[in-house]
Amino acid sequence: MDTAQKQRWAITLSYDGSRFYGWQKQADGVPTVQAALETALAQIAGEAVSTTVAGRTDTGVHATAQVVHFDTTAARPQQAWVRGVNAHLPEGIAVLHARQVAPEFHARFDAYGRHYRYLLESAPVRSPLLKNRAGWTHLKLDIEPMRRAAAYLIGEQDFSSFRAAECQAKSPVKTIYRADLTQSAGLVRLDLHGNAFLHHMVRNIMGALVYVGSGRLSVEGFAALIQERSRLKAPPTFMPDGLYLTGVDYPEAYGIIRPQIPEWL
């Protein structure tokens, strides 16, 4: 069919990252979020569908509000891209919203902000009920120095100290707008809002903050670590289990819905 007849759709989805080998589909056929989603979309579209995501997630990393766009010549009502697609998705993935968007909309390049939450359990014994849902440390954490340390993340900075060796980003300079830490019932929540994030950046930040909270790294040492701009001197990368992509920001004109973070999280 004529490509001029194609429609561009944006969908918001949630997924349990512990069930998949990351977002990106792989040649060896292991289960990934992208592969499962494109298979389900093709069932509704009656044609192959290729997706573009706001931000790829690694194995074990979850999303409550990931955004994807795709093009199709199939004329389907909005609910077909929600309920219809969900009927063909495996457990662990759900489409929350769908919206036809302007043909120039791009899920990745039009995003000007991203939100992440890291959920951390601090307890002598790891709860089996939180396995794959939260990170864990047996160490008792002092939240106040962790908050003071997190304040040093705010602003435009070179975050090379929290950048994975395999990161493909062109620049390590990113802007963090908000870095909040809260604690209740043995769970620590780190909320980060920034324009973009480096590979493993949130997990590396969490690893360093755990060092601060347990007394292995001072607040001043955390601040100095950022200025070092060297991953070699930083604490280890923290586990993926507790990391959630909780939102993506777009210009209002596109009408992309950003759901509230679920109360259970």
Curated annotation (Swiss-Prot):
Disulfide bonds: none annotated. Gene3D superfamilies: Pseudouridine synthase I, catalytic domain, C-terminal subdomain (3.30.70.660), Pseudouridine synthase I, catalytic domain, N-terminal subdomain (3.30.70.580). Pfam families: PseudoU_synth_1. NCBIfam families: hisT_truA. Substrate binds at Y116. Belongs to the tRNA pseudouridine synthase TruA family. It comes from the Bacteria. Homodimer. Keywords: Isomerase, tRNA processing. GO terms for biological process: tRNA pseudouridine synthesis. One of its GO terms (molecular function) is RNA binding. InterPro entries: PsdUridine_synth_cat_dom_sf (IPR020103), PsdUridine_synth_TruA (IPR001406), PsdUridine_synth_TruA_a/b_dom (IPR020097), PsdUridine_synth_TruA_C (IPR020095), TruA/RsuA/RluB/E/F_N (IPR020094). It catalyses: uridine(38/39/40) in tRNA = pseudouridine(38/39/40) in tRNA. Its EC number is 5.4.99.12. It comes from Neisseria meningitidis serogroup A / serotype 4A (strain DSM 15465 / Z2491). This is tRNA pseudouridine synthase A. The active site is at D58 (nucleophile). The keyword Isomerase applies. Formation of pseudouridine at positions 38, 39 and 40 in the anticodon stem and loop of transfer RNAs.
